[in-house]
């Protein structure tokens, strides 16, 4: 039935350019509060520079580049009002990993982003950017920042941020929201 999907899959292939697969299953799709679902995806993208021509003729088109090879993999899930996702993008020896979760019943959420030797210059070669190493964690509960019960925290550590051949890493940010009060600390 439309409400239950036992198994679904997708395969996209263009020799020399794209190899992408995804599969998943779901129950109670039409009721987000009861939905249970899981999905996985994996892609290998090569020699995709031809896509740059599809961008509007603008300053962005002249500044952006698509690396020769990009790998993408991840998962997503839903469990009766709780949603999660995890994804990793790899290229030119670097990686971005993203994980997140949201529980709509308890209004709890969290996200983690990691960049390990991620080559920003592979995407924006004209912007004097280099490698990026950082870790970001954020989480909390409650959606209204003015309510005293809402809590949140952010932790950011930038170990390396290259710009014009210099490293501007070594920056840390910690911020907390609790009891209607926001506090934070920035250090280098």
Predicted feature residues:
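Short flexible loop/turn segments that cap and initiate beta-strands
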Residues: 148-152
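Sequence/structural signature of outer-membrane beta-barrel proteins
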Residues: 118-122, 159-163
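Tryptophan-anchored aromatic micro-motifs
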Residues: 154-158
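Extended lipid/amphipathic-ligand handling interfaces
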Residues: 1-3, 9-14, 19-41, 62-80, ...
């Amino acid at each position: 039935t439309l409400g239950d999907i036992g198994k679904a899959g997708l395969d996209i292939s263009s020799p020399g350019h794209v190899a992408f697969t995804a599969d998943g299953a779901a129950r109670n799709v039409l009721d987000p509060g009861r939905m249970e679902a899981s999905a996985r995806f994996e892609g290998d993208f090569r020699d995709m520079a031809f896509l740059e021509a599809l961008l509007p003729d603008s300053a962005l088109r002249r500044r952006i580049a698509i690396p020769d090879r990009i790998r993408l993999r991840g998962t997503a899930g839903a469990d009766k009002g709780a949603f999660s996702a995890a994804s990793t993008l790899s290229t030119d020896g670097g990686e971005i990993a993203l994980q997140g979760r949201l529980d709509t019943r308890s209004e709890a959420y969290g996200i983690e982003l990691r960049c390990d030797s991620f080559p920003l210059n592979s995407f924006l070669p004209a912007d004097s950017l280099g490698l990026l190493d950082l870790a970001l964690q954020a989480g909390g509960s409650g959606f209204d920042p003015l309510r005293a019960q809402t809590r949140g925290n952010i932790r950011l550590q930038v170990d390396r941020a290259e710009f014009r051949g210099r490293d501007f890493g070594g920056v840390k940010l910690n911020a907390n929201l609790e009891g209607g009060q926001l506090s934070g600390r920035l250090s280098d």
